[in-house]
Amino acid sequence: MNDQGIKESIETLKEQIRKYDYHYYVLDEPLVPDAEYDRCFKALQQYEEQYPQFLSPDSPTQRVSGTPSDAFMPVAHKQPMLSLSNVFTTDELKAFIKRAIEKLDEPNQQLVFACEPKLDGLAVNMTYEGGILTHAATRGDGAVGENITANIKTIASVPLRLRVSNPPKLIEVRGEVYIPKADFEAYNARARELGEKTFANPRNAAAGSLRQLNPEISASRPLAIYCYGIGACEDYKLPNSHLEQLNLLKEFGFRVSPETRRAVGIEGCLDYYQYMLAKRNQLPFEIDGVVYKIDSISLQQQLGYVSRAPRFACAHKFPATEEMTRLIAVDFQVGRTGAVTPVARLEPVSVGGVTVSNATLHNFDEITRKDIRIGDTVIIRRAGDVIPEVVSVILEKRPANARMIELPKNCPVCGSEVVREADEAIARCVGGLYCKAQLKRMMWHFASRKAMYIEGLGSVLIDQLVDEGIVHHLADLYELDLQTLASLPRMGEKSAKNLLSALEKSKKTTFNRFLYALGIREIGEAGARVLAEHYCDVEGLKAATIEELMTLNDIGPVAASHVVHFFAQAHNLEVIDRLLELGIHWPKSEKIQVNQQNPFFGKTVVLTGTLSTMGREEAKAKLLALGAKVSGSVSSKTDYVVAGSEAGSKLIKATELGVAIIEEDEFLKWVNS
């Protein structure tokens, strides 16, 4: 057979296999037995091995690369992948639609919506040039994502070439990668049998599987995808309807959710919401709400975008899922400040698709208020679909032998006394750093990014250092040596040297970071900055009184008493002195006198978006230096919102609440005046 004949045979096999793939993975209608498919696939492989000059990147054999990537490279999206604004109630949905209608050229028209399930997976962007899949990326920050091309190719229902003879010059196809419920359960069952790691939920499994450096691992996972939209498109006339564009994607060879529906007006949207809510547990995939999009593309273009969210679409989230189960025991966990937190151990129950066997009880006031007892049948909710909590007790199911939950007299970790102050809901272990649980959490906080920032000192290594008796106090970290570190499991000489370098680098810090790192109760990042600005050094704080501290912005009576108590404890001062002797230092500064006439003094300010002249932390530092309180969320108590480019949902909320919005130019004038 000559070269032309060989090339034609290869193309025939490729077309045949693509057809089989499409019917099997997209239409769920197998055309041939598996054995016949395998024979065709093997024949194609043999041809390509024998005649590599005819191997092309869109061949079905190229779905998996055997060579692991060194790292994920950044990929810029041609058209940004925007997030959706969320609504949780009917009133919020009505307000969203009302705002959209008011911005249209013809506000009295009846709106038609494309309604889709909101899959709980990982959003991806696939780029096709001349009909060939050239690269794929995660959403990332909306503008730039991670290159996952090799991994996307392992998903059999993703076409490597569009099923049309006249494809667009370039098109971006957006979709959600997920793992079906049944496949997730089967995968976890196999993993348990093999003693391998299992996943907590399908969403985590999908995200973890897709972001593997080795695409062969991705290929071993049961990944699937539904496509939901088009980004950039060049040299191709798209329909003026989102629903018609979804039909076009089907023609191109993509899977589109069969649950997509057309709805008219708000009533149609609410009907779809109730329909999907009722059907949620019967669906083969996880969803956490529904998405409404105005169907007309021309109307979408009229409405445009607010920062990172479109005005023409929103996600209507489902309420937290609740289930019933039995509370069989209560354990106690110890935090950084000694807080003893009760944790419910439950008979395992599936809540919103996740098996829950533990739930927070918050504190003893909550236990008393809800009258929770061991043996009770309780209602469990995944708060925010993430953190399981005990909501209430079903009293009529309470057994005769139900037992009261008692506060332990001694710490479950170190055996020290557990004390609960009369006016506090939280009980605490008094063991301090003698308690291994507190020491571990304290070390983790001390090393964190906003504290001393000791890169490479993570929770696993901290556990080793404390459990092996290598570290007994914070200062012991700075006396670690290469031999000790290198001898630890999974450490090695290179990692040990890197950690020692990070420890040395962390010695040069600032007074506010050092104070924050000490973990004084009720003193967060902002409070530490206020203290550092007014006291400059440890000696000044040692002499501070509660009354004096309370005159400072953002320091209340509780925080003030904790500061005075902390610096009155001899063992705390010993640790501080030892840390300073080991080389921790910061630039000396003069006591700052804040001009109380500046416009930010005493005001609550929220930063959102990107400032072109400075980073978020620098802007925050300037505001704090002017006596402002910088908050992470917008509320009715917010005085100003400083809005940079690509400002997000905080800007929307500020507008809705009537909060004053300051653009970057005005912000710079105020802080520099």
Swiss-Prot record:
EC number: 6.5.1.2
The organism's place on the tree of life at top rank: Bacteria
CDD domains for this protein: BRCT_DNA_ligase_like, LIGANc
Any GO BP annotation: DNA replication
InterPro entries registered for this protein in UniProt: BRCT_dom (IPR001357), BRCT_dom_sf (IPR036420), DisA/LigA_HHH (IPR041663), DNA_ligase (IPR001679), DNA_ligase_AS (IPR018239), DNA_ligase_CS (IPR033136), DNAligase_adenylation (IPR013839), DNAligase_N (IPR013840)
Keyword set includes Magnesium: yes
PROSITE patterns: BRCT, DNA_LIGASE_N1, DNA_LIGASE_N2
Sorted UniProt keywords: DNA damage, DNA repair, DNA replication, Ligase, Magnesium, Manganese, Metal-binding, NAD, Zinc
One GO CC annotation: cytosol
List of catalytic residues: 118 (n6-amp-lysine intermediate)
Positions that bind NAD(+): 34-38, 83-84, 116, 139, 176, 293, 317
The keyword Metal-binding is annotated on this UniProt entry: yes
Ranges where the BRCT domain occurs: 595-673
A Gene Ontology molecular function term of the record: metal ion binding
SUPFAM superfamilies: BRCT domain, DNA ligase/mRNA capping enzyme, catalytic domain, Nucleic acid-binding proteins, RuvA domain 2-like
Cofactors required: Mg(2+); Mn(2+)
Protein purpose: DNA ligase that catalyzes the formation of phosphodiester linkages between 5'-phosphoryl and 3'-hydroxyl groups in double-stranded DNA using NAD as a coenzyme and as the energy source for the reaction. It is essential for DNA replication and repair of damaged DNA.
Family: Belongs to the NAD-dependent DNA ligase family. LigA subfamily.
Protein name, as recorded: DNA ligase
